[in-house]
Curated annotation (Swiss-Prot):
Keyword terms, alphabetized: ATP-binding, Cytoplasm, Kinase, NAD, NADP, Nucleotide-binding, Transferase
UniProt organism field: Nostoc sp. (strain PCC 7120 / SAG 25.82 / UTEX 2576)
Name recorded for this polypeptide: NAD kinase 2
Active site annotation, chain numbering: 78 (proton acceptor)
Binding positions for NAD(+) per the UniProt entry: 78-79, 152-153, 182, 193-198, 251
EC identifiers of the protein: 2.7.1.23
Domain of life from the UniProt record: Bacteria
Pfam families: NAD_kinase, NAD_kinase_C
Catalytic activity: NAD(+) + ATP = ADP + NADP(+) + H(+)
Lineage, opening ranks: Bacteria, Bacillati, Cyanobacteriota, Cyanophyceae, Nostocales
Length: 305
C-alpha cells in the first residue's frame, strides 16, 4: 500500500478541514495516510529564565513519516512550509505545498487547484526541485546547546533598547572580520527573497550553491552583503553585548551570550519540492514580488503641458 503524508496548519480552519477531507479521499483510494499538524516543526522560543530551547534535528519527524513515503501534502502558507521542511527533510520526503495562506512564495499551487494537483502527483507527473538547508548550532566550548535545520535564514540581532552590536565573523578559513550593526543575517538562496532581501541583500537563484551574509543596519559604508560558496562554514562570535537574540526561519530561537558562538554550515539534508510545472524562478519573482514589471507612470493632479 503506497504511503502519503499530510501536514497542515492547525491555526487555519480551512487547512484542517481540507486535511481531513483529503485523508478520507486518499484512504478510500487505497493509500496509507499519515496526518499531522505543522506545530511539530515549530522550534519555539527560549526565555530569559530558560535561555536554551533545544530541539534535536532528527526529533521533529512525525510518527508514520519515513523514507518509504511517496510525498507529503502541505496545507498552509510559507510559515507552514518552513516548519514542514524541518519535519520531512531528514527522511527525504518530497513536499507538495498547497497555499491556504497569503503570499505563498514557497507553495506550488492554490487550494482551488488541489484536485488536479493531487491527481498529477499520484500519477508521478512532476519534477523535484531540491533546495539547500543550513544546520545552525549554538556552541559553548565544544558542547552543543541548541541546533536546528534552517531553510530561509538565521538572524542574530540585538534586543530592543540596547546598543549596537559588534560581531566577529569567520567564513571558512578566511581571516575573521568585525561588523558593527544591529544584527546579521546568514541566508540560503531560498532565504534571499525573505528578510535578507529587505535588509539589502541580493536575490539569489535557488540552484546557485552559495550562502550570503547580510548586515542589518550596519554602522559602516564598507559593511555590505557578502555572497560566498556554501562549502564554507561560518562562525559568529558576539563581542560586546551581554545577550543577543537568534531567530531561525522566523519561528524559533534562543539567547546568545558572550561565551557562545553560532556555527552554520550547509546541511546534508535538503528540501525536495514537487513542481507540477518546470520551475520558473523569475516568473515567481514577477508574480509574487513584482520583479521586472514595467514601470507605469502614476496619475498626477497637475496637468502637464
Amino acid at each position: 500500500m503506497p504511503k502519503v503524508g499530510i501536514i497542515y496548519n492547525d491555526i487555519k480552519p480551512v487547512a484542517g478541514r481540507v486535511a481531513i477531507e483529503l485523508k478520507d479521499k486518499l484512504t478510500a483510494a487505497g493509500w496509507d495516510v499519515s496526518i499531522t499538524s505543522s506545530i511539530g516543526g515549530i522550534l519555539g522560543y527560549s526565555n530569559p529564565e530558560s535561555p536554551v530551547c533545544h530541539t534535536p534535528i532528527d526529533g521533529l519527524t512525525p510518527p508514520g513519516f519515513d523514507s518509504e513515503m511517496k510525498f507529503a501534502i502541505v496545507l498552509g502558507g510559507d510559515g507552514t512550509v518552513l516548519a514542514a521542511s524541518r519535519q520531512v527533510a531528514p527522511c527525504g520526503i518530497p513536499i507538495l505545498a498547497i497555499n491556504t495562506g497569503h503570499m505563498g512564495f514557497l507553495t506550488e499551487t492554490y487550494l482551488n487547484q488541489l484536485p488536479q494537483a493531487i491527481d498529477q502527483a499520484i500519477a508521478g507527473e512532476y519534477e523535484i526541485e531540491e533546495r539547500a538547508m543550513l544546520t545552525v548550532k549554538v556552541l559553548r566550548g565544544e558542547s552543543v546547546l541548541w541546533e536546528a535545520l534552517c531553510l530561509n535564514e538565521m538572524v542574530l540581532h540585538r534586543e530592543p533598547l540596547t546598543s549596537m552590536c559588534h560581531f566577529e565573523i569567520a567564513v571558512g578559513r578566511h581571516a575573521p572580520v568585525d561588523i558593527a550593526a544591529d544584527g546579521v543575517i546568514v541566508s540560503t538562496p531560498t532565504g534571499s527573497t525573505a528578510y535578507s532581501l529587505s535588509a539589502g541583500g541580493p536575490v539569489v537563484a535557488p540552484g546557485v550553491p552559495v550562502l550570503q551574509l547580510v548586515p542589518i543596519c550596519p554602522h559602516s559604508l564598507a559593511s555590505r552583503a557578502l555572497v560566498f560558496p556554501d562549502t564554507e562554514p561560518v562562525n559568529i562570535y558576539p563581542v560586546n553585548i551581554p545577550r543577543l537574540v537568534m531567530v531561525v526561519d522566523g519561528n524559533g530561537g534562543c539567547y546568545i551570550f558572550p561565551e557562545d558562538r553560532v556555527y552554520l554550515e550547509r546541511s546534508p539534508y535538503s528540501v525536495k519540492f514537487i513542481r507540477l510545472q518546470p520551475p520558473e524562478f523569475f516568473r515567481i519573482l514577477r508574480e509574487k514580488l513584482g520583479w521586472g514589471l514595467p514601470h507605469i507612470a502614476k496619475p498626477t493632479s497637475v496637468e502637464l503641458p
